Regions:
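Histidine/acidic-residue-rich catalytic or RNA/ligand-binding cores of hydrolases
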Residues: 169-186, 191
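A glycine-rich, hydrophobic loop/mini-helix early in the fold
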Residues: 64-102
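Glycine- and Gly-Pro-enriched alpha-helical subdomains that act as flexible
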Residues: 93-133
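Divalent metal-coordination and catalytic microenvironments
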Residues: 19, 63, 92, 120, ...
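Histidine-centered catalytic micro-motifs
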Residues: 54-71, 161-166
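Generic N-terminal segment detector
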Residues: 1-47, 157
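Conserved small/polar residues in nucleotide/adenosyl-binding loops
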Residues: 199-204
């Protein structure tokens, strides 16, 4: 059985692109998050209705972060107007490898040009590694702080990317920040490897 829903005149003039990864039980999760759980409470065979119970952290799969996720006293998702999620979109390709950093210079030189009011998607290529893996989370590229300043100064509407977060993993709880600071990070082995890489690079520069 298949269903179709007709589009109105306004929607029929637009192109829609689904950028979401599949979501459900077993979706890749941050190292300290519980798995998504989907339970069937009623099924067609027994109850003639389908009722499901979903237990999840909202910060899972392809999602939007509200400012309140990281900055105290800022808006939650329900406090942001719907108009903030619609507008002109631009996808820029800025390939990065393991622990790469997206900088303001990268954004300034990106094509097509990023304009004020754009919703910007930065494609680092890391979506190809999306999985329940140490590589996707621990070795991910991230944005340098000057990139955030560049976005703000440019006046973009929203920013999306294909990495585990906008932040570099070594600026998250994977490293000694936040909930796992006293443990040396959620993934201390990754922190040790990163520190060794920095030490080796510094020694090579001398």
């Amino acid at each position: 059985m298949s269903f179709t829903w007709p589009l109105g005149n306004a929607e029929s003039q637009l192109e829609f692109y689904d950028l979401s990864h599949p979501w459900g039980h077993g979706v890749p999760a941050w190292p300290y998050f519980e798995d998504v759980k989907v339970e069937r409470l009623h099924g067609m065979a027994k109850s003639r209705v389908l009722t499901q119970k979903i237990t999840t952290v909202m910060h899972s799969g392809t999602h939007i972060d509200a400012p309140a996720h990281v900055v105290e006293g800022t808006p939650f998702l329900d406090e942001i107007p719907l108009s903030a999620f619609f507008g002109t979109g631009v996808v820029v390709s800025i390939p990065k490898n393991k622990w790469g950093v997206v900088t303001a210079e990268d954004l300034e030189n990106a094509t097509p040009e990023i304009r004020p009011g754009d919703i910007v998607i930065v494609n680092t290529g890391w979506h190809r590694k999306y999985a329940d893996s140490a590589e996707y989370y621990a070795y991910s590229p991230g944005f340098y702080k000057d990139a955030g300043g560049w976005f703000a100064a440019k006046g973009v509407k929203a920013v999306g990317t294909d990495t585990q977060a906008l932040d570099h993993p070594m600026a998250t709880a994977i490293a000694p920040h936040g909930p796992a600071e006293h443990l040396g990070g959620m993934l201390p082995w990754a922190v040790k490897e990163y520190d060794c890489l920095l030490y080796t690079s510094d020694a090579a520069d001398e």
